[in-house]
Amino acid sequence: MLKKNDIVEVEIVDLTHEGAGVAKVDGLVFFVENALPSEKILMRVLKVNKKIGFGKVEKYLVQSPHRNQDLDLAYLRSGIADLGHLSYPEQLKFKTKQVKDSLYKIAGIADVEVAETLGMEHPVKYRNKAQVPVRRVNGVLETGFFRKNSHNLMPLEDFFIQDPVIDQVVVALRDLLRRFDLKPYDEKEQSGLIRNLVVRRGHYSGQIMVVLVTTRPKVFRVDQLIEQVIKQFPEIVSVMQNINDQNTNAIFGKEWRTLYGQDYITDQMLGNDFQIAGPAFYQVNTEMAEKLYQTAIDFAELKKDDVIIDAYSGIGTIGLSVAKHVKEVYGVELIPEAVENSQKNASLNKITNAHYVCDTAENAMKKWLKEGIQPTVILVDPPRKGLTESFIKASAQTGADRIAYISCNVATMARDIKLYQELGYELKKVQPVDLFPQTHHVETVALLSKLDVDKHISVEIELDEMDLTSAESKATYAQIKEYVWNKFELKVSTLYIAQIKKKCGIELREHYNKSKKDKQIIPQCTPEKEEAIMDALRHFKMI
């Protein structure tokens, strides 16, 4: 039995979702940082539980041809670039696989094509926003990034994936904080003044916002600090203060103050101008966000008479991008400043058919339903926790033709798609987009279409209404699906089962009238699944 500090030779067979190597030894699964599939290593055991363990690389015996040898390991240790040791083409393949695996394991979906992940031409130095902790390290005020799975600061000046100008602003602010002897936050003692520095920079405009996150309102000589940093970076148009006096991991507190200039920066997205406030959500990779949103727009196949609901609308980036091409846009966002920004952004771009409210997405959806607003397309871009069940049910009740789902967490997206399918929607397209190169995170766009008589034949059998002989089994669709999965590990749809039943001469009761249109889009059962269904029908003595 392996124990702590044992050294053993292992081969890495897989990667976890977070990018750790996976090795199997003596019936245990070990997770190893900075190890890639096909690599053989000497592994030191760090920790062992009943079924899993953790190890670290003592020595590489065989290295992967896909290893990026040039990566500074500080970016791995901090988690800034937890996939940076893997070549970029392989990162994209890894992310495509993550999306496919989640859809299959969580939603049971294997028959919808997942397109290859859209990558970035230059996959470094892309982030338009930095959130940098300020701490004392060896007696000196430092800025940097926390070591992975800890709150121990690693001093850094080059963050690898951030806009280089943002890195320069952070270093300049660090030096000024030292010069003016402003005390960094001490998490253990709950003391000190400066907790975090947040810097935004417009990808197209170049405008810069600086946010000082402090534990109390008064900042000694703050006017002089601002004067000095603006001398170095005249592109700074906004200096904000956020006051966070709570014992929390949250970056921002509730109180905001404008110390210099305006309380927003302006940048462009898909041809529109957007004002971006300090607390507002705005995608951190502008170049790839435009591809992400354009994909969602293309998937939705918008028409002039479409009515759009833009849930989790942020500052209106996607809703305002489509407003000029549709009849109406209704957006909902929980952050008041973001709603105010979206309303200003609509005016800024002379858009009059976009309407925004401050509320939870599920509450707004229910209110709009009561008001008789009938959307044809719903756009959702929720946080990592995904959609609530009440929102999904309310959105399905609208009868919207199409739902374009933008997700930053494929696991919760797969969970939500599963419920949408139960409520009469079908997954049609999936496109991963790499908004976060060098990390394990991936954004995904999925298109759901409502099943209707114009495009699909949906059949349902009511066995109790059929005249079955004593030899026939009353196997339900669910039982047939379960049998096929247990024996063949294949997922088969109700439609496929119905097709094979019809082929075998089993009479079906149609749930809907068949469409009279010539061009019906009806998926056809594959030969492999047909044989599995036939086996099930024989098992249940239905043929």
From Swiss-Prot:
Lineage top rank: taxon: Bacteria
Keywords: Methyltransferase, S-adenosyl-L-methionine, Transferase
GO molecular function, one term: rRNA (uridine-C5-)-methyltransferase activity
SUPFAM superfamilies hit by this protein: Nucleic acid-binding proteins, S-adenosyl-L-methionine-dependent methyltransferases
Protein name per Swiss-Prot or TrEMBL: Uncharacterized RNA methyltransferase SP_1029
Enzyme class, first EC level, given as a word: transferase
Active site (record annotation): C408
GO BP term (any one): rRNA base methylation
InterPro entries, alphabetized: MeTrfase_TrmA_AS, MeTrfase_TrmA_CS, NA-bd_OB-fold, SAM-dependent_MTases_sf, TRAM_dom, U5_MeTrfase_fam
Keyword Electron transport: no
Similarity comment text for this entry: Belongs to the class I-like SAM-binding methyltransferase superfamily. RNA M5U methyltransferase family.
Organism annotation: Streptococcus pneumoniae serotype 4 (strain ATCC BAA-334 / TIGR4)
